[in-house]
């Protein structure tokens, strides 16, 4: 089955100016999504859709990435990703339709290619129409109706560990059968979720999110080597373990 990835990357961002091209731990944020798409074992085509000349110029530096200029009507704040993804994919199907379309957000730099490939492998072996990246985040939550009345979004008050699974979309990726991708949506009748590791789930929306992601990407590994024997004892080994896990 042929798989195409669409990376939607607007030039404007109210929360973080030039977010997609701002350096995240030494390289533009969008580079992480492009890198994952190119490294995937299942992806055949990588498309970057943007209204920004800067983003398009950067994406064009990659040999196997097609940079597509986005019309201004598709770059407005109120426009959802559905028509954007449809526009990008439909412009690249002169030689035939793709079987699967993956929307890969540039705002999830912690996502690993191993997780992406695991999700694609799961989807391709299933009968699902759509697969959405999620994290399990059970909490006692409340909702509000149109009249302003609040009501619980749970049936029974329980400890967090006893609550039913509650999936929250991470925004990292959304995988769809090609026939489900239209200007009005990307969800089919059969929708599944793929739980990503908590450490890969951050979606950059605020400056705080940015700082968190950058600090995690900038972490350095420290190797502890501890030698011990019967005469020397192993007390120092336990102290080293305390340091390693502190």
Language-model-derived ranges and their functions:
Residues 3-49:
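N-terminal glycine-rich phosphate-binding loop and ensuing alpha1 helix
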Residues 83, 87, 108-197:
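Conserved core of the sugar-phosphate nucleotidyltransferase
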Residues 33, 238-246:
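Short amphipathic alpha-helix
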Residues 182-195, 199-202, 207-221:
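Catalytic donor-sugar/metal-binding loop of nucleotide-sugar-dependent glycosyltransferases
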Residues 4-10, 220-230:
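Nucleotide-activated donor-dependent transferases that construct or modify glycoconjugates
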Residues 53-100, 110-114, 118:
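Short phosphate-binding loop-to-helix
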Residues 15-19, 25, 228-239:
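A short, glycine/small-residue-rich beta-strand->loop->alpha-helix junction that serves as a flexible
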